[in-house]
């Protein structure tokens, strides 16, 4: 990873910030810090350049030293954490020491503590929230959603602003007080370029761009080994839109031919528009998509969302099905906020990469996952007991799957099975159709498919497909990704 910072030719001095994350729990790995990410993104959007992030323990002397140093170097200092009623909440004491002050019970905060907690004794733990440095200012923000004034203020001393450590409170506070930091004289502009080549293959071009434009434009190069569609994300950043566009044009013109990927960053949010556009394209794939959407729409006309779930185990077919289902719901019920229901029949010894993909997909599509161990028939028996409201299950079955040639788009389970309507929108899709659909719309799929696997089961019965094996120029054995398989009949030869 490389990144350069521009020495911008401008008469306007930059407005800068330093962020201090305070908490033993962060340093010990007990809690993941998300506050610095939010603050960096928010501050940059209002013209403030974050120059440094520091994570320090709940120690008064360390807090004081870090704040004193940051306060002298940056326009603003934002701290997060260490505010509360317990012994390790010592941020206010650290701030006071940084400025050579004492803390005292601020009358306004004492009154607020009494109102919120019903406590008035000076020694009670809650009253520690009212004990702040003597030169403190109280900043009351406004909830931008409701227009209501915050009941509890943000404390600041000089150019130091003391935010809570709880992410929801910090985010609400910074949003409601962003006028304290807003810099309308500076606007940051950036462009992203997704590249399918490895970093080493474009290093020379990046060096040339940096040499030409670094005075006005910063260039960052960030490898992403887990992305299905690109290997490196290039980010151009500048205060000057004109310089940014000049650098962007030069870089595009000098990168190797064919390596720039027209990547769609968030295909889920745009699912309905993109999927239905493809369905109306008149292409062979578009016709398959249109037929699948028709089946899904008929299912949604017959069953309410509360009675439908999608069978999802992370494979390529059900990933395509999930995206189609999400798009259909998004189009049919644009105001629908409830989670889509999904059945995950978890096999023995699943690949860790598949488990990770399941987790990320659950979050990406806002799913309510019902996880059941074992084989499909027994899983449906358990599902009927645990979720008796469900009546239909969407399946990613294709006619090329075992025992599937006589199925119809909507058919009941066999008499000796739990009673469900099986909805099969992908019956007439081929292996190539699945991959064309996923990759045309830049839909994320399990990374194992990029490593030579074409059909995924458990770690015990699945190997890389030998039909995808090749030898690199250096003589090493490697595998093409699954979407490059030429003979579809070889899809399952890697399953034992």
From Swiss-Prot:
Pathway: Cofactor biosynthesis; FAD biosynthesis; FAD from FMN: step 1/1
Region of interest called Molybdenum cofactor biosynthesis protein-like, as start-end residue ranges on this chain: 18-109
Keywords carried by this UniProt record: ATP-binding, Cytoplasm, FAD, Flavoprotein, FMN, Nucleotide-binding, Nucleotidyltransferase, Transferase
Cross-referenced InterPro entries: FAD_synth_MoaB/Mog-bd, FLAD1_M, MoaB/Mog-like_dom_sf, MoaB/Mog_dom, PAPS_reduct_dom, Rossmann-like_a/b/a_fold
EC id: 2.7.7.2
Record flagged with keyword RNA-binding: no
Named cofactor requirement(s): Mg(2+)
Subcellular location field: Cytoplasm
Taxonomic superkingdom: Eukaryota
Enzyme class (EC, first level): transferase
Family: In the N-terminal section; belongs to the MoaB/Mog family.
Name recorded for this polypeptide: FAD synthase
